[in-house]
A protein has these predicted regions:
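N-terminal presequence-like segments and the immediate start of the first folded domain
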Residues: 1-71, 76-128
Length: 128
């Protein structure tokens, strides 16, 4: 069973949001690389919820859960959605990560995703 130690580096200061500076993985038998997930929806929050439901489904299919996540990479189409994304995480991440140890996350703003209606995509790395 993998041990994932989520931690911040004091010399780097506090992270800007709900993420940690690094995840140290030891004892992993397997590493999961989950493709960027997209979800339909009429608004940004609906897409975020759908994306993370799909990630949870993928994790469960491999016998994993939120505690197995070592890193997220998030792609947003519009920079004005950053506050919405942060608000969504503030509301939902405590349910997903009740210990308050949030995996590292890289947030990128891109020109577009694979199809126009999609506003958010999240890629995940997990360890078992």
């Amino acid at each position: 069973m993998a041990e994932i130690k989520i931690q911040n580096v004091e010399a780097l200061g506090q992270p800007l949001g709900q993420y940690s500076h690094m995840a140290r993985v030891t004892g992993a038998r397997e590493t999961l690389y989950i493709a960027g997930m997209l979800a339909p929806g009429d608004d940004f929050d609906a897409q975020c919820s759908g994306v993370f439901r799909q990630i949870e489904t993928a994790l469960k299919s491999a016998g994993a859960g939120w505690g197995s996540v070592a890193q997220f990479t998030t792609y947003l189409v519009h920079s004005q959605d950053i506050p919405r994304f942060m608000a969504w995480r503030l509301r939902e991440f405590p349910k997903m990560f009740p210990d308050g140890k949030y995996p590292p996350n890289t947030l990128l703003i891109v020109d577009r995703l694979v199809q126009e209606p999609f506003l958010v995509e999240v890629q995940t790395i997990a360890a078992l």
